[in-house]
Amino acid sequence: MKKLKRIAVCTVIILICFLLETTIFQYLALASVIPNLLIVVTSSFGFMRGRKEGLFIGFFCGLLKDILGGDLIGFYALVYMVIGYCNGFFSRVFYDEDIKLPLALISASELVYSLIVYIFLFMLKSDFNFWYYFNHIIMPELVYTILITLGLYQVILHMNRRLEEEEKRSASKFV
């Protein structure tokens, strides 16, 4: 029952972030870029819950992006899966009181995501203007994502703490 509740909460978080990214933040674009909320969700669950959950959350975030806005089905799912899985390696050194590690990991994830998108969606189409892409898309999106992360991460952290407390309470009833 608790696992089902965690799945439902994660699904709601993913859907809300996707809807915010594709609706409201389209109107709040700065320098024609929007924050990547799904990277924040994928990275956060990766380093909070581990590699396996980071992989699954990343897959569903990427698949949602593929189905509702991508050119290639599976491209974003693969990219987000790898990012979630790699963030899961840091679950052992994650302390929820310290925000420096989450900000660094989310920033690195956003940078890796943007570089992969550039390489596979632009450079392979003979668009070699990397510095223009870096200065006008990657860096503004990175800064905007970091600013939004300061608030969104706290919400995700609070939800994760509540779910973990409920899981611990229900586990202690059976012992």
Where are these regions (language model features)?
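Terminal, non-globular segments
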Residues: M1-V175
